[in-house]
Protein backbone atom coordinates (compact mmCIF):
# COMPACT_ATOMS: atom_id res chain seq x y z
CA UNK A 1 0.00 0.00 0.00
CA UNK A 2 1.55 3.37 -1.08
CA UNK A 3 1.47 6.62 0.87
CA UNK A 4 -1.54 8.02 -1.03
CA UNK A 5 -3.61 4.95 -0.22
CA UNK A 6 -2.65 5.20 3.46
CA UNK A 7 -3.64 8.87 3.57
CA UNK A 8 -7.10 7.94 2.33
CA UNK A 9 -7.74 5.86 5.44
CA UNK A 10 -9.87 7.44 8.19
CA UNK A 11 -8.23 8.58 11.43
CA UNK A 12 -10.02 5.88 13.39
CA UNK A 13 -8.35 3.16 11.33
CA UNK A 14 -4.94 4.84 11.43
CA UNK A 15 -5.02 5.12 15.22
CA UNK A 16 -5.97 1.46 15.39
CA UNK A 17 -2.91 0.58 13.31
CA UNK A 18 -0.68 2.76 15.51
CA UNK A 19 -2.03 1.03 18.62
CA UNK A 20 -0.04 -2.08 17.67
CA UNK A 21 3.25 -0.16 17.86
CA UNK A 22 5.21 0.82 20.97
CA UNK A 23 4.33 4.42 21.75
CA UNK A 24 7.89 5.57 21.07
CA UNK A 25 7.48 4.37 17.47
CA UNK A 26 3.98 5.77 17.16
CA UNK A 27 5.32 9.22 18.07
CA UNK A 28 7.79 9.08 15.17
CA UNK A 29 4.91 9.21 12.68
CA UNK A 30 4.21 12.82 13.75
CA UNK A 31 6.80 14.09 11.24
CA UNK A 32 5.03 12.59 8.22
CA UNK A 33 2.62 15.47 7.67
CA UNK A 34 0.41 18.02 9.40
CA UNK A 35 -2.35 15.43 9.65
CA UNK A 36 -0.06 12.99 11.45
CA UNK A 37 1.39 15.55 13.87
CA UNK A 38 -1.00 14.82 16.74
CA UNK A 39 -2.59 11.61 15.49
CA UNK A 40 -0.50 9.46 17.86
CA UNK A 41 -2.02 11.32 20.82
CA UNK A 42 -5.42 9.90 19.96
CA UNK A 43 -4.20 6.31 20.13
CA UNK A 44 -5.94 4.62 23.13
CA UNK A 45 -2.73 2.78 24.02
CA UNK A 46 0.31 3.81 26.03
CA UNK A 47 3.16 1.29 25.69
CA UNK A 48 6.44 2.56 27.11
CA UNK A 49 9.82 1.50 28.44
CA UNK A 50 11.37 4.22 30.58
CA UNK A 51 14.76 3.33 29.10
CA UNK A 52 13.53 4.98 25.87
CA UNK A 53 13.59 8.38 27.59
CA UNK A 54 16.51 10.51 28.80
CA UNK A 55 16.57 11.28 32.51
CA UNK A 56 13.01 11.34 33.89
CA UNK A 57 11.28 12.86 30.87
CA UNK A 58 9.03 9.81 30.65
CA UNK A 59 7.00 11.04 33.65
CA UNK A 60 6.03 14.34 32.03
CA UNK A 61 5.39 12.49 28.76
CA UNK A 62 2.88 10.17 30.46
CA UNK A 63 1.24 13.05 32.33
CA UNK A 64 0.81 15.03 29.10
CA UNK A 65 -0.56 12.01 27.23
CA UNK A 66 -3.14 11.27 29.91
CA UNK A 67 -4.08 14.95 30.13
CA UNK A 68 -4.63 15.16 26.37
CA UNK A 69 -6.85 12.07 26.48
CA UNK A 70 -8.69 13.07 29.64
CA UNK A 71 -12.12 12.34 28.18
CA UNK A 72 -11.08 9.27 26.19
CA UNK A 73 -11.20 5.64 27.23
CA UNK A 74 -7.88 3.80 27.51
CA UNK A 75 -7.54 0.38 25.94
CA UNK A 76 -4.03 -0.49 27.10
CA UNK A 77 -1.46 0.86 29.55
CA UNK A 78 1.94 -0.83 29.55
CA UNK A 79 4.91 0.55 31.45
CA UNK A 80 8.24 -1.14 32.07
CA UNK A 81 10.82 0.31 34.44
CA UNK A 82 14.53 -0.49 34.45
CA UNK A 83 17.27 -0.59 37.05
CA UNK A 84 18.18 3.05 36.56
CA UNK A 85 14.75 4.68 36.74
CA UNK A 86 11.91 3.74 39.02
CA UNK A 87 9.35 6.31 40.14
CA UNK A 88 7.87 5.03 43.39
CA UNK A 89 5.30 7.82 43.61
CA UNK A 90 3.73 8.06 40.17
CA UNK A 91 3.00 4.49 39.03
CA UNK A 92 0.06 3.96 41.39
CA UNK A 93 -1.44 7.30 40.35
CA UNK A 94 -1.21 6.46 36.66
CA UNK A 95 -2.86 3.11 37.32
CA UNK A 96 -5.72 4.86 39.14
CA UNK A 97 -6.22 7.16 36.16
CA UNK A 98 -6.19 4.43 33.52
CA UNK A 99 -8.51 2.17 35.51
CA UNK A 100 -10.97 5.05 35.91
CA UNK A 101 -10.90 5.47 32.12
CA UNK A 102 -12.02 1.92 31.41
CA UNK A 103 -8.67 0.23 30.80
CA UNK A 104 -8.83 -3.20 29.15
CA UNK A 105 -5.18 -4.28 29.33
CA UNK A 106 -2.94 -3.25 32.23
CA UNK A 107 0.74 -4.24 32.23
CA UNK A 108 3.01 -2.76 34.92
CA UNK A 109 6.57 -3.98 35.43
CA UNK A 110 8.43 -2.44 38.34
CA UNK A 111 12.06 -2.89 39.28
CA UNK A 112 13.84 -3.66 42.56
CA UNK A 113 15.79 -0.57 43.51
CA UNK A 114 15.62 -1.89 47.06
CA UNK A 115 15.14 -5.60 47.65
CA UNK A 116 12.61 -5.02 50.41
CA UNK A 117 10.61 -2.22 48.78
CA UNK A 118 7.63 -2.51 46.43
CA UNK A 119 5.13 0.05 45.23
CA UNK A 120 1.65 -1.18 46.01
CA UNK A 121 -1.09 -1.00 43.42
CA UNK A 122 -4.24 1.07 44.11
CA UNK A 123 -7.31 -0.81 45.22
CA UNK A 124 -9.43 0.41 42.33
CA UNK A 125 -7.88 -2.38 40.22
CA UNK A 126 -10.17 -4.73 42.21
CA UNK A 127 -13.28 -2.93 40.91
CA UNK A 128 -12.63 -2.60 37.18
CA UNK A 129 -15.49 -3.82 34.99
CA UNK A 130 -13.53 -3.41 31.74
CA UNK A 131 -10.20 -5.06 32.61
CA UNK A 132 -9.53 -8.08 30.35
CA UNK A 133 -5.85 -8.77 31.04
CA UNK A 134 -3.70 -7.86 34.05
CA UNK A 135 0.07 -8.28 34.26
CA UNK A 136 1.92 -7.12 37.38
CA UNK A 137 5.65 -7.70 37.89
CA UNK A 138 7.76 -6.64 40.91
CA UNK A 139 5.06 -4.59 42.59
CA UNK A 140 2.80 -5.14 45.59
CA UNK A 141 -0.93 -5.65 46.04
CA UNK A 142 -2.89 -5.11 49.23
CA UNK A 143 -5.72 -7.07 50.78
CA UNK A 144 -8.95 -5.81 49.16
CA UNK A 145 -11.18 -3.99 51.63
CA UNK A 146 -14.30 -5.03 49.70
CA UNK A 147 -15.57 -7.84 47.49
CA UNK A 148 -13.44 -8.07 44.35
CA UNK A 149 -15.34 -7.57 41.08
CA UNK A 150 -13.42 -8.15 37.84
CA UNK A 151 -16.22 -9.47 35.61
CA UNK A 152 -14.25 -9.23 32.33
CA UNK A 153 -10.80 -10.41 33.44
CA UNK A 154 -9.63 -13.40 31.39
CA UNK A 155 -5.84 -13.24 31.73
CA UNK A 156 -3.85 -12.59 34.93
CA UNK A 157 -0.06 -12.74 35.29
CA UNK A 158 1.46 -12.01 38.71
CA UNK A 159 5.24 -12.26 38.98
CA UNK A 160 7.42 -11.36 41.95
CA UNK A 161 4.44 -9.62 43.55
CA UNK A 162 4.24 -8.97 47.29
CA UNK A 163 1.04 -9.56 49.22
CA UNK A 164 0.23 -7.97 52.57
CA UNK A 165 -2.41 -8.39 55.25
CA UNK A 166 -4.08 -11.69 54.35
CA UNK A 167 -2.60 -15.10 53.48
CA UNK A 168 -5.76 -15.93 51.50
CA UNK A 169 -5.67 -12.77 49.37
CA UNK A 170 -5.35 -14.77 46.15
CA UNK A 171 -8.51 -16.72 46.89
CA UNK A 172 -10.38 -13.44 47.34
CA UNK A 173 -9.09 -12.08 44.04
CA UNK A 174 -9.83 -15.22 42.01
CA UNK A 175 -13.33 -15.48 43.46
CA UNK A 176 -14.05 -12.09 41.90
CA UNK A 177 -12.93 -13.20 38.42
CA UNK A 178 -15.84 -15.30 37.07
CA UNK A 179 -14.43 -15.59 33.50
CA UNK A 180 -10.71 -15.99 34.30
CA UNK A 181 -9.16 -18.45 31.83
CA UNK A 182 -5.38 -17.98 31.94
CA UNK A 183 -3.48 -17.50 35.22
CA UNK A 184 0.29 -17.29 35.73
CA UNK A 185 1.65 -17.00 39.27
CA UNK A 186 5.38 -16.77 39.92
CA UNK A 187 5.96 -16.43 43.64
CA UNK A 188 8.71 -14.04 44.78
CA UNK A 189 11.79 -15.18 46.67
CA UNK A 190 11.15 -14.05 50.25
CA UNK A 191 14.55 -12.56 51.06
CA UNK A 192 12.89 -10.12 53.45
CA UNK A 193 10.89 -12.76 55.37
CA UNK A 194 7.60 -11.28 54.19
CA UNK A 195 4.44 -13.16 53.32
CA UNK A 196 4.68 -14.65 49.83
CA UNK A 197 1.37 -16.46 49.73
CA UNK A 198 1.89 -19.02 52.48
CA UNK A 199 -1.53 -20.47 51.69
CA UNK A 200 -2.27 -20.44 47.98
CA UNK A 201 -5.77 -21.55 47.09
CA UNK A 202 -6.83 -21.46 43.44
CA UNK A 203 -10.51 -22.27 43.08
CA UNK A 204 -12.11 -21.41 39.76
CA UNK A 205 -14.92 -22.78 37.60
CA UNK A 206 -13.65 -20.94 34.50
CA UNK A 207 -9.86 -21.42 34.63
CA UNK A 208 -8.40 -23.30 31.65
CA UNK A 209 -4.66 -22.67 31.97
CA UNK A 210 -2.57 -22.29 35.14
CA UNK A 211 1.17 -21.91 35.53
CA UNK A 212 2.63 -21.97 39.05
CA UNK A 213 6.31 -21.34 39.78
CA UNK A 214 7.69 -21.39 43.33
CA UNK A 215 11.27 -22.58 43.26
CA UNK A 216 13.09 -21.05 46.20
CA UNK A 217 12.54 -19.79 49.72
CA UNK A 218 15.07 -18.69 52.33
CA UNK A 219 12.66 -18.90 55.26
CA UNK A 220 11.43 -21.91 57.20
CA UNK A 221 7.82 -20.93 56.58
CA UNK A 222 5.17 -23.60 56.02
CA UNK A 223 3.67 -23.31 52.54
CA UNK A 224 0.64 -25.00 51.03
CA UNK A 225 -1.09 -24.95 47.66
CA UNK A 226 -4.58 -26.09 46.67
CA UNK A 227 -5.85 -26.20 43.08
CA UNK A 228 -9.52 -26.87 42.40
CA UNK A 229 -10.40 -26.12 38.78
CA UNK A 230 -12.74 -28.57 37.01
CA UNK A 231 -12.31 -26.88 33.59
CA UNK A 232 -8.52 -26.70 33.73
CA UNK A 233 -6.97 -28.02 30.51
CA UNK A 234 -3.29 -27.07 31.01
CA UNK A 235 -1.22 -27.08 34.20
CA UNK A 236 2.44 -26.08 34.52
CA UNK A 237 3.49 -27.07 38.04
CA UNK A 238 6.91 -25.96 39.29
CA UNK A 239 6.71 -25.90 43.08
CA UNK A 240 9.53 -27.15 45.29
CA UNK A 241 8.57 -25.41 48.52
CA UNK A 242 5.01 -26.36 49.43
CA UNK A 243 4.70 -28.86 52.27
CA UNK A 244 1.07 -29.53 51.41
CA UNK A 245 -0.16 -29.95 47.84
CA UNK A 246 -3.82 -30.58 47.09
CA UNK A 247 -4.99 -30.93 43.48
CA UNK A 248 -8.56 -31.99 42.77
CA UNK A 249 -11.34 -31.93 40.19
CA UNK A 250 -8.93 -32.19 37.25
CA UNK A 251 -11.44 -33.96 35.02
CA UNK A 252 -10.75 -31.69 32.02
CA UNK A 253 -6.96 -31.74 32.27
CA UNK A 254 -5.38 -32.46 28.89
CA UNK A 255 -1.73 -31.41 29.32
CA UNK A 256 0.59 -31.07 32.30
CA UNK A 257 4.19 -29.92 32.63
CA UNK A 258 5.67 -31.10 35.96
CA UNK A 259 8.98 -29.89 37.33
CA UNK A 260 8.81 -30.45 41.07
CA UNK A 261 10.56 -32.37 43.82
CA UNK A 262 7.42 -32.23 46.00
CA UNK A 263 9.64 -30.85 48.77
CA UNK A 264 11.22 -34.29 49.10
CA UNK A 265 14.87 -33.34 48.74
CA UNK A 266 15.66 -29.64 48.47
CA UNK A 267 14.58 -27.87 51.64
CA UNK A 268 12.54 -30.82 52.85
CA UNK A 269 12.74 -34.32 54.22
CA UNK A 270 13.67 -37.36 52.17
CA UNK A 271 10.92 -39.75 51.19
CA UNK A 272 11.20 -42.59 53.68
CA UNK A 273 8.93 -45.64 54.15
CA UNK A 274 7.51 -44.19 57.35
CA UNK A 275 6.69 -40.79 55.84
CA UNK A 276 3.07 -41.61 55.06
CA UNK A 277 1.98 -37.97 54.79
CA UNK A 278 4.43 -37.05 52.05
CA UNK A 279 3.80 -40.32 50.25
CA UNK A 280 0.05 -39.68 50.32
CA UNK A 281 0.52 -36.15 48.96
CA UNK A 282 2.40 -37.52 45.93
CA UNK A 283 -0.15 -40.31 45.45
CA UNK A 284 -3.11 -37.92 45.58
CA UNK A 285 -1.40 -35.53 43.14
CA UNK A 286 -0.70 -38.30 40.63
CA UNK A 287 -4.19 -39.71 40.98
CA UNK A 288 -5.76 -36.28 40.45
CA UNK A 289 -3.90 -35.76 37.16
CA UNK A 290 -4.26 -39.35 35.94
CA UNK A 291 -6.73 -38.36 33.19
CA UNK A 292 -4.10 -36.25 31.40
CA UNK A 293 -3.35 -36.96 27.71
CA UNK A 294 -0.04 -35.12 27.26
CA UNK A 295 2.69 -34.94 29.93
CA UNK A 296 6.07 -33.23 30.16
CA UNK A 297 8.06 -34.40 33.18
CA UNK A 298 11.46 -33.27 34.43
CA UNK A 299 14.38 -35.40 35.50
CA UNK A 300 14.14 -34.41 39.15
CA UNK A 301 10.44 -35.25 39.26
CA UNK A 302 11.19 -38.69 37.86
CA UNK A 303 13.86 -39.13 40.53
CA UNK A 304 11.27 -38.46 43.24
CA UNK A 305 8.90 -40.92 41.59
CA UNK A 306 11.71 -43.48 41.62
CA UNK A 307 11.71 -43.34 45.42
CA UNK A 308 7.94 -43.31 45.47
CA UNK A 309 7.69 -46.40 43.23
CA UNK A 310 9.85 -48.36 45.67
CA UNK A 311 7.19 -47.80 48.34
CA UNK A 312 3.92 -48.03 46.39
CA UNK A 313 2.98 -48.45 42.71
CA UNK A 314 2.66 -45.38 40.48
CA UNK A 315 -1.00 -44.81 39.49
CA UNK A 316 -2.04 -45.65 35.93
CA UNK A 317 -2.27 -42.97 33.24
CA UNK A 318 -4.69 -44.75 30.93
CA UNK A 319 -5.40 -41.68 28.76
CA UNK A 320 -1.79 -40.61 28.29
CA UNK A 321 -0.83 -40.80 24.62
CA UNK A 322 2.15 -38.38 24.55
CA UNK A 323 5.02 -38.22 27.06
CA UNK A 324 8.12 -36.03 27.08
CA UNK A 325 10.63 -36.97 29.78
CA UNK A 326 14.13 -35.86 30.73
CA UNK A 327 16.34 -38.87 31.54
CA UNK A 328 19.99 -39.75 32.06
CA UNK A 329 21.96 -42.99 31.95
CA UNK A 330 21.21 -43.68 35.61
CA UNK A 331 17.43 -43.46 35.13
CA UNK A 332 16.66 -46.00 32.43
CA UNK A 333 15.10 -48.60 34.73
CA UNK A 334 12.97 -45.87 36.31
CA UNK A 335 11.84 -44.84 32.84
CA UNK A 336 10.57 -48.36 32.19
CA UNK A 337 8.75 -48.42 35.53
CA UNK A 338 7.01 -45.16 34.65
CA UNK A 339 6.16 -46.38 31.14
CA UNK A 340 4.39 -49.36 32.70
CA UNK A 341 1.95 -46.82 34.15
CA UNK A 342 1.20 -45.55 30.62
CA UNK A 343 -0.39 -48.59 28.93
CA UNK A 344 -1.78 -46.68 25.93
CA UNK A 345 1.16 -44.39 25.18
CA UNK A 346 1.63 -43.62 21.47
CA UNK A 347 4.35 -40.94 21.37
CA UNK A 348 7.47 -40.80 23.53
CA UNK A 349 10.07 -37.99 23.52
CA UNK A 350 13.23 -38.48 25.59
CA UNK A 351 15.56 -35.59 26.38
CA UNK A 352 18.64 -37.71 26.99
CA UNK A 353 21.56 -36.50 29.10
CA UNK A 354 24.95 -38.20 29.21
CA UNK A 355 25.87 -37.96 32.88
CA UNK A 356 28.79 -39.18 34.97
CA UNK A 357 26.43 -41.21 37.15
CA UNK A 358 26.76 -44.99 36.95
CA UNK A 359 24.48 -46.76 34.52
CA UNK A 360 21.70 -48.91 35.96
CA UNK A 361 21.38 -52.60 35.24
CA UNK A 362 20.48 -53.74 31.74
CA UNK A 363 17.22 -52.91 30.01
CA UNK A 364 15.35 -56.18 30.32
CA UNK A 365 11.78 -55.33 31.30
CA UNK A 366 9.29 -54.45 28.51
CA UNK A 367 6.29 -52.25 29.47
CA UNK A 368 2.86 -52.94 27.99
CA UNK A 369 2.83 -49.84 25.76
CA UNK A 370 5.83 -51.13 23.77
CA UNK A 371 3.91 -54.29 22.99
CA UNK A 372 0.64 -52.69 21.92
CA UNK A 373 0.49 -48.91 21.36
CA UNK A 374 3.85 -47.09 21.09
CA UNK A 375 4.15 -45.79 17.51
CA UNK A 376 6.75 -43.01 17.66
CA UNK A 377 9.89 -42.55 19.77
CA UNK A 378 12.13 -39.49 19.59
CA UNK A 379 15.47 -39.44 21.41
CA UNK A 380 17.14 -36.05 21.65
CA UNK A 381 20.74 -35.03 22.33
CA UNK A 382 22.15 -38.41 21.33
CA UNK A 383 25.88 -38.81 20.87
CA UNK A 384 26.73 -41.54 18.42
CA UNK A 385 29.21 -43.95 19.91
CA UNK A 386 28.06 -43.24 23.47
CA UNK A 387 27.25 -46.64 24.96
CA UNK A 388 24.09 -45.92 26.96
CA UNK A 389 22.44 -43.99 24.15
CA UNK A 390 23.07 -46.84 21.72
CA UNK A 391 21.61 -49.31 24.23
CA UNK A 392 18.49 -47.17 24.39
CA UNK A 393 18.16 -47.16 20.60
CA UNK A 394 18.68 -50.94 20.45
CA UNK A 395 16.10 -51.46 23.20
CA UNK A 396 13.27 -49.59 21.46
CA UNK A 397 13.98 -51.16 18.07
CA UNK A 398 14.11 -54.64 19.58
CA UNK A 399 11.03 -54.45 21.80
CA UNK A 400 8.53 -52.06 20.18
CA UNK A 401 6.01 -54.20 18.31
CA UNK A 402 4.02 -51.47 16.49
CA UNK A 403 6.70 -48.78 16.26
CA UNK A 404 6.34 -46.73 13.06
CA UNK A 405 9.00 -44.08 13.55
CA UNK A 406 12.23 -43.73 15.55
CA UNK A 407 13.66 -40.20 15.44
CA UNK A 408 17.25 -39.68 16.56
CA UNK A 409 18.31 -36.08 17.14
CA UNK A 410 22.10 -36.07 17.31
CA UNK A 411 23.92 -33.56 19.45
CA UNK A 412 27.22 -33.64 17.54
CA UNK A 413 26.84 -31.71 14.28
CA UNK A 414 30.36 -32.67 13.26
CA UNK A 415 29.11 -36.04 12.05
CA UNK A 416 26.52 -34.53 9.71
CA UNK A 417 28.20 -36.19 6.74
CA UNK A 418 28.33 -39.63 8.30
CA UNK A 419 24.67 -40.61 7.92
CA UNK A 420 25.55 -43.60 5.74
CA UNK A 421 27.84 -44.98 8.44
CA UNK A 422 25.17 -44.44 11.09
CA UNK A 423 22.49 -46.18 9.04
CA UNK A 424 24.90 -49.02 8.37
CA UNK A 425 25.40 -49.47 12.09
CA UNK A 426 21.66 -49.23 12.78
CA UNK A 427 21.00 -51.91 10.18
CA UNK A 428 22.75 -54.39 12.47
CA UNK A 429 20.24 -53.70 15.28
CA UNK A 430 17.34 -56.11 15.72
CA UNK A 431 14.08 -54.46 14.62
CA UNK A 432 10.81 -55.88 16.07
CA UNK A 433 8.58 -53.74 13.85
CA UNK A 434 9.39 -54.19 10.17
CA UNK A 435 7.55 -51.00 9.20
CA UNK A 436 9.61 -48.82 11.55
CA UNK A 437 11.32 -45.87 9.84
CA UNK A 438 14.52 -44.51 11.40
CA UNK A 439 15.04 -40.76 10.93
CA UNK A 440 18.31 -39.01 11.82
CA UNK A 441 18.27 -35.27 12.49
CA UNK A 442 21.39 -33.23 13.22
Swiss-Prot record:
| Domain spans labelled FBD | 358-410
Q: Which domain of life is it from?
A: Eukaryota
Pfam families assigned: F-box, FBD, LRR_At5g56370
Q: Which UniProt keywords apply?
A: Leucine-rich repeat, Repeat
Q: Which InterPro entries match?
A: F-box-like_dom_sf, F-box_AtFBL13-like, F-box_dom, FBD, FBL13/AtMIF1-like, LRR_dom_sf, LRR_FXL15/At3g58940/PEG3-like
Cite the repeat ranges for LRR: 128-160, 162-187, 188-214, 234-260, 278-309, 324-352
In this chain the F-box domain maps to: 3-49
Q: What is this protein called?
A: F-box/FBD/LRR-repeat protein At2g26030
Q: Which organism is it from?
A: Arabidopsis thaliana
